[in-house]
Curated annotation (Swiss-Prot):
Keyword match Transmembrane: no
Protein family membership: Belongs to the ATPase delta chain family.
Keyword field: ATP synthesis, Cell membrane, CF(1), Hydrogen ion transport, Ion transport, Membrane, Transport
Protein name according to UniProt: ATP synthase subunit delta
Organism the protein comes from: Streptococcus equinus (Streptococcus bovis)
NCBIfam families per the UniProt record, alphabetical: ATP_synt_delta, PRK05758.2-1
Subunit structure: F-type ATPases have 2 components, F(1) - the catalytic core - and F(0) - the membrane proton channel. F(1) has five subunits: alpha(3), beta(3), gamma(1), delta(1), epsilon(1). F(0) has three main subunits: a(1), b(2) and c(10-14). The alpha and beta chains form an alternating ring which encloses part of the gamma chain. F(1) is attached to F(0) by a central stalk formed by the gamma and epsilon chains, while a peripheral stalk is formed by the delta and b chains.
GO CC, alphabetical: plasma membrane; proton-transporting ATP synthase complex
Membrane topology designation: Peripheral membrane protein
Superkingdom per UniProt: Bacteria
Amino acid sequence: MDKKTQALVEQYAKSLVEIAIEKDSLAELQSETEALLSVFEETNLADFLSSLVVSRDEKVKLVRLLQESSSVYMNNFLEVILQNEREAFLKAILEGVQKDFVIATNQHDIVVTTAVALTDEQKERILALVAEKFGVKAGKLVENIDESILGGFVINVNNKVIDTSIRRQLQEFKMNLK
């Protein structure tokens, strides 16, 4: 995506998030955005909307179908997209909206890598640790099992890492011996 298109996508995304904050409907618009993005993932909707072969009328009909199950704010947003003939960028805009929601709500996904599966108690302790260390609210807790870390855990949140794995400790020990 070129810089001009990226700027356009970011502006539309930012505008929708600002409206959601102003109207105190972040949660509602966030779930609608996730639902629309899942439609894009499950179908070839992005290809359809960006196709030069498909007529504008067909694209408008399809977006109108999406509007039927949307809130007033999302309907208005989709209407602006149609009026400005930006439907080809709808998926990218919605992805931008999702990123902006994360920033606005400070809810980041937490990726935890362990050698064995975590218990519910351990998950709660990790959520508390992340809130304390990084000052963020948990979005989703994504658990990865990687036996090569041998023990401990690696937590990734918003490009920040806590690595208490035995593998890392052994690597540090090895470096200190040299």
